[in-house]
């Protein structure tokens, strides 16, 4: 059985993000602002009739495909998107925006409060991926070695928002 951070699951081949420096999003627009902007855009064009969950999901998948095309056939040895040419960076920005717009629209149509859902999901991830078992490991939680500590002891009593960047996603 592998130890956390070594073994079969590996470390995910993380890029050196320190070279790019720290990044943070601008505080605006909020997800609610994005939801409202898109709802107004669709209403002005009488497109709400087409925005059923299935259609929004398929549009989202299509946009994710367009985003994936930007990365297709690029080698892992090539510099990351931070070093792309301006035209490629602009396309990346547009496709990521399309993905976010459709994700927010789908969540709104399904009445899912994304910020609350993210906090809940990160709490679940924190329980599934205790730091002492998952640090440096790309293993799925079902494949992590189990130590002698219970999940409650391993998770600790820290603030749920404090470790958002330290957990693997599922």
Swiss-Prot record:
One of its GO terms (biological process) is nucleoside triphosphate catabolic process. It comes from the Eukaryota. Residues 1-25, 149-170 are annotated as: Disordered. Hydrolyzes deoxynucleoside triphosphates (dNTPs) to the corresponding nucleoside monophosphates. Has a strong preference for dCTP and its analogs including 5-iodo-dCTP and 5-methyl-dCTP for which it may even have a higher efficiency. May protect DNA or RNA against the incorporation of these genotoxic nucleotide analogs through their catabolism. Keywords: Acetylation, Cytoplasm, Hydrolase, Magnesium, Metal-binding, Phosphoprotein. The modification Phosphoserine is found at residue 2. It catalyses: dCTP + H2O = dCMP + diphosphate + H(+). One of its GO terms (molecular function) is identical protein binding. This is dCTP pyrophosphatase 1. Its main location: cytoplasm. Substrate binds at residues 38, 47-51, 73, 102. GO terms for cellular component: cytosol; mitochondrion; nucleus. The keyword Metal-binding applies. Its cofactor is Mg(2+). InterPro entries: dCTP_Pyrophosphatase (IPR052555), DCTPP (IPR025984). The gene is Dctpp1. It comes from Rattus norvegicus. It is found in: Cytoplasm, Cytosol. Homotetramer. Its EC number is 3.6.1.12. The modification N-acetylserine is found at residue 2. Mg(2+) binds at residues 63, 66, 95, 98.
């Amino acid at each position: 059985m592998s130890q956390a951070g070594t073994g079969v699951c590996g470390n995910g081949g993380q890029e050196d993000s320190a070279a790019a420096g720290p990044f943070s999003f601008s505080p605006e627009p909020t997800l609610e602002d994005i939801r409202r902007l898109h709802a107004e855009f669709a209403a002005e064009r009488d497109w709400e009739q087409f925005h059923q969950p299935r259609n929004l999901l398929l549009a989202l998948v299509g946009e994710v495909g367009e985003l994936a095309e930007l990365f297709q056939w690029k080698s892992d040895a090539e510099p990351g998107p931070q070093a792309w040419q301006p035209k490629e960076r602009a396309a990346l920005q547009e496709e990521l925006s399309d993905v976010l717009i459709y994700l927010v629209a789908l969540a709104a149509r399904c009445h899912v409060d994304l910020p609350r859902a993210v906090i809940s999901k990160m709490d679940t991830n924190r329980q599934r991926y205790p730091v002492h078992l998952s640090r440096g490991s790309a293993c799925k939680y079902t494949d992590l070695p189990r130590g002698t500590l219970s999940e409650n002891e391993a998770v600790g009593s820290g603030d749920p928002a404090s470790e958002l960047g330290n957990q693997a996603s599922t």
